Amino acid sequence: MALRSPQYIFGDFSPDEFNQFFVTPRASVELPPYGGTVLCGAQAADDLPDGHDYQRIEFGVNEVIEPSDTLPRTPNYSISSTLNPQAPEFILSCTTSKKLPDDIDKEVNYSSANCQYPGPALALDGGSPAEAEALENDGVSGGLGQRERKKKKKRPPGYYSYLKDGGEGGPSAEALVNGHAGPAVSNSVGAEDTDLMGDVPTAGTPRTWGSPQDATDFVSDAGPAGAFPGALDGGARTAGQLEGCPGADSEASCLPAEAGRDTLLRTAVAQPSVGTDTTENLGVTNGQILESLGEGTAANGVELHTVESSDSDPAKAESAPPPADAPASAAGTVPASQPAKSWASLFHDSKPSSSSLPVVSVETKYSPPATSPLVSEKQAEVKEGLVPVSEDPVAIKIAELLENVTLIHKPVSLQPRGLINKGNWCYINATLQALVACPPMYHLMKLIPLYSKVQRPCTSTPMIDSFVRLMNEFTNMPVPPKPRQALGDKIVRDIRPGAAFEPTYIYRLLTVIKSSLSEKGRQEDAEEYLGFILNGLHEEMLNLKKLLSPNNDKLTISNGPKSHSVNEDEQEEPGEGSEDEWEQVGPRNKTSVTRQADFVQTPITGIFGGHIRSVVYQQSSKESATLQPFFTLQLDIQSDKIRTVQDALESLVARESVQGYTTKTRQEVEISRRVTLEKLPPVLVLHLKRFVYEKTGGCQKLIKNIEYPVDLEISKELLSPGVKNKNFKCHRTYRLFAVVYHHGSSATGGHYTTDVFQIGLNGWLRIDDQTVKVVSQQQVVRPAAERTAYLLYYRRVDLL
């Protein structure tokens, strides 16, 4: 007895018929009883998901691939074994049965990314499930039903329903998927259907014949493999398959077709879940990120603009309006007057024609993002917010506070924080870390209230405001853990630095106050920046003092000379002579005259301000002395004899001869000059002058090791004669608390880092921009080839 097995008979087709009906990668012929979709074409098996094996039959070849009996039969696949491409309903433009809106939820419509052809709907699986089940049972059993069916002309499921129910007014189809047409849907979709609109994954879908291979033509290849969890979950499905939405993990809902909407964009590129807080990424095309525009259209001429925000709200993205240059018909319905196309014409070329819906190829013209106006706007806000102290209502409060302030030198244990350097700001970051480690500077800024933009929209003290904000970035450090014993006798201390931040408000001060440091091409110098800070804070505090004493002439910001004589009988008229020229004392044997520049005290001068006395000795004349203020003490280290900081200090006060000086009578005289320390500040900053300017205009760096102690004692010989016996040893002894290093051998480049003493750790920290690590005291004072000490910060020990 012959074994009754399913037989599949295919007719002889001419080459033209074969090319029309069977040459397409997206066409699928589903054969019973195996239920596996047979994909045709060279690209069919390339993009299948893992774990799925599909039977492949190639037409027009001599060898027939025998099917495997182990292919499972699942009800998830609909069977269409009576496909006859020569049926008249597939060649002529027949209409489908009219669907009601209630049928939307029963069927799944897929908008093919490469088969968007308007025209009559072509439903290949319009038959009822009962009819399909009967056909499947007949095919399996091979009984009488199958023999009777062989005698009949093969008709597709639902063929007679076309003749019975087909009529005018049938909706036009949107697309064919795998050679099948989905149910037509009215253009008006309710709110419930809109909420159900989701994504149709295509990561594992075979590419259509003639579809663009490059990702720049379309974004279907942009996502990584496995990026779309719903891609081909259970293998290939026909358009008429009834299947629920993907699982909760993918959070994608079934997508009903809606003409004229952005369904193609959603089909080609799967969107992430709605619950994310980050920007929705659709894919990368030519290095740009195409962002989801929610309900935006994908019509012709609509561009996908790059959205730069990384914390955009998805709800805002859904409500974003379409671009202004989008045509009005983009979000409307499909034009009704479309040329009718035959079923066979769909397989000639999947590239859209000029008359087809312009949703296959989305124009992604790259528009470079505009320069972020964040910095410029903030900078403009600060400039516009600058007002005179007389127009600043908060200025009088700060002035009264600074007038009665008492400097606090008590050490404070702050949690260290690195400073992010996104530009060439290392010389600023290094200086800021040293100032934060200065206790009186920290306490002074913490005494001034921190005002918000709402509380103080206009300011007359931008530098004070910025440093008050900087000091408030640092908080008290938690109690440090006990030192733990490491290998050997070394003590290892742990440090927990806070999060690094970028002090952009400090950087903007360079342009707001129009400092010369902001000029392009200038050497970035940490000592010059320190002077810029201290002088700027000092001048703002002087302006605040004017509010309390508006008629006080001494508060003028001037370095003009003021004559002061020890012997009032010999006092000269004020304003006679100039501070810049040598003043010759009268021939009578009287006490020398000391000339002093106006230097009004502020809290900044109370911390960093000192005085040096410059005395000029002239033959046959008495001494002429001038008092000059300083914030940093300049130490010349160019001589080969200078190896330590003490050597540089002694060289500073050494008597030097001045050649070529002439009097008013054009007579050359021999003079000499000596500098001594008149007043020592609580915080002494020593500047090792490593950058030497040549006569040709160039600049070179002195790379030599200068030894500096942790405890520095200022010798009595360095002091002025009038203050030698007034300063006790405790007033002349300092302790190192910060070192600013310069790295590199070039005077016009390099890098800056800082070592600071941490009182809570009772040790040293090395801060390189945002990097913070613990170092030993020996590492701080030990010379190194890669770095040289540039600024030394000392505190008086009697104030510790």
Curated annotation (Swiss-Prot):
Biased amino acid composition, Acidic residues: 568-583
Description of activity control: Specifically inhibited by spautin-1 (specific and potent autophagy inhibitor-1), a derivative of MBCQ that binds to USP10 and inhibits deubiquitinase activity. Regulated by PIK3C3/VPS34-containing complexes.
InterPro entries: PAM2_motif, Papain-like_cys_pep_sf, Peptidase_C19, Peptidase_C19_UCH, USP_CS, USP_dom
Annotated spans, Disordered: 132-159, 306-335, 555-596
Reactions that this protein is recorded to catalyse: Thiol-dependent hydrolysis of ester, thioester, amide, peptide and isopeptide bonds formed by the C-terminal Gly of ubiquitin (a 76-residue protein attached to proteins as an intracellular targeting signal)
Basic and acidic residues bias locations: 306-316
Compositionally biased region (Polar residues): 555-564
UniProt modified residues of type Phosphoserine: S211, S337, S367, S372, S549, S565, S578
Post-translational modification: Phosphorylated by ATM following DNA damage, leading to stabilization and translocation it to the nucleus.
Record carries keyword Nucleotide-binding: no
Region of interest (Interaction with p53/TP53), ranges: 2-100
Biased composition (Low complexity): 326-335
Stored Pfam families: PAM2, UCH
Alphabetic keyword roster: Acetylation, Autophagy, Cytoplasm, DNA damage, DNA repair, Endosome, Hydrolase, Nucleus, Phosphoprotein, Protease, Thiol protease, Ubl conjugation, Ubl conjugation pathway
Region annotated G3BP1-binding, chain positions: 6-21
Protein function: Hydrolase that can remove conjugated ubiquitin from target proteins such as p53/TP53, RPS2/us5, RPS3/us3, RPS10/eS10, BECN1, SNX3 and CFTR. Acts as an essential regulator of p53/TP53 stability: in unstressed cells, specifically deubiquitinates p53/TP53 in the cytoplasm, leading to counteract MDM2 action and stabilize p53/TP53. Following DNA damage, translocates to the nucleus and deubiquitinates p53/TP53, leading to regulate the p53/TP53-dependent DNA damage response.
Similarity section: Belongs to the peptidase C19 family. USP10 subfamily.
Assembly description: Found in a deubiquitination complex with TANK, USP10 and ZC3H12A; this complex inhibits genotoxic stress- or interleukin-1-beta (IL1B)-mediated NF-kappa-B activation by promoting IKBKG or TRAF6 deubiquitination. Interacts with IKBKG; this interaction increases in response to DNA damage. Interacts with TANK; this interaction increases in response to DNA damage. Interacts with TRAF6; this interaction increases in response to DNA damage. Interacts with ZC3H12A; this interaction increases in response to DNA damage.
Protein name per the record: Ubiquitin carboxyl-terminal hydrolase 10
Underlying gene: USP10
